[in-house]
Amino acid sequence: MSRRRQIYEGKAKILYEGPEPGTIIQYFKDDATAFNAQKKGMISGKGVINNRVSEHIFTLLAGIGIPTHFIRRLNMREQLVKQVEIIPIEVVIRNVAAGSLSKRLGIEEGTPLPRTIIEYYYKDDALNDPMVADEHIACFGWATQEEMHDIADMAIRVNDFMSGLFAAINIRLVDFKLEFGRVWENDYSRVLLADEISPDGCRLWDMVTNEKLDKDRFRQDLGGEVEAYQEIARRLGLLPVEPDTEVLDLESHRKNRGL
């Protein structure tokens, strides 16, 4: 069967025309990028794991009433989703100080935040996705006030649910990003959770060891990216656990880096 028309290729996914009007096929790649694609590489099997993890989380979120673009997984690397008009705002939810927040404000990485922080970034690679305020979003018409209310409400609900989901498998949800899109029904639009939720867009730390089980292993040259992604999938019950499976130990990667 011939491949359907390609619509768009991003850093981590390729979008193809879907089989029915109003649908799109998301293909998950193994490509890894960091620092706005200044650093590039490959994580073997990443696309397969991200597809499964995102499917799992989106399905659970739909079960608690979060509207999403996800329809169904098609195969190991592809899923069928609703076509949405992407709102050009990346929403970052932070529970623990890490990454750019630590650098901007001089807060030690790993410091628990007294309250959850929601940040907004304008999606523009040429501008390095600058942080923006609600006033910018309203001024330039990127989203309406009602849409931003829905986005903030969903972001908090997703954070509450995912924090519990990961805590149950001894993983700390440090921070993560979400994207949203709008679908039109006649003259009325509604906001859906879109894109993906996977170790690519979440900071996930082991609660006991503080090992990083996410793309920071690639960003910071820690090694063990494949093992970390697989560990997330295993703990979520998405990969079979062999009887002789050892507890994840990334010590060898630290030794290879002379740490």
UniProtKB/Swiss-Prot annotation:
Record keywords: ATP-binding, Ligase, Nucleotide-binding, Purine biosynthesis
Q: EC number(s) on record?
A: 6.3.2.6
- UniProt catalytic activity: 5-amino-1-(5-phospho-D-ribosyl)imidazole-4-carboxylate + L-aspartate + ATP = (2S)-2-[5-amino-1-(5-phospho-beta-D-ribosyl)imidazole-4-carboxamido]succinate + ADP + phosphate + 2 H(+)
Cite the SUPFAM superfamilies for this sequence.
Answer: SAICAR synthase-like
Question: Do the record's keywords include Ligase?
Answer: yes
Query: Could you give one GO CC term from the UniProt record?
Result: cytosol
Q: Which InterPro entries match?
A: SAICAR_synt/ADE2_N, SAICAR_synt_PurC, SAICAR_synth, SAICAR_synthetase, SAICAR_synthetase_CS
Transmembrane residues, as ranges?
none
GO terms, biological process: 'de novo' IMP biosynthetic process; cobalamin biosynthetic process
GO function terms (MF aspect): ATP binding; phosphoribosylaminoimidazolesuccinocarboxamide synthase activity
Q: What class of enzyme is it?
A: ligase
UniProt-listed Pfam families: SAICAR_synt (PF01259)
Q: Pathway listed for it?
A: Purine metabolism; IMP biosynthesis via de novo pathway; 5-amino-1-(5-phospho-D-ribosyl)imidazole-4-carboxamide from 5-amino-1-(5-phospho-D-ribosyl)imidazole-4-carboxylate: step 1/2
Family according to the record: Belongs to the SAICAR synthetase family.
**Protein name according to UniProt:** Phosphoribosylaminoimidazole-succinocarboxamide synthase
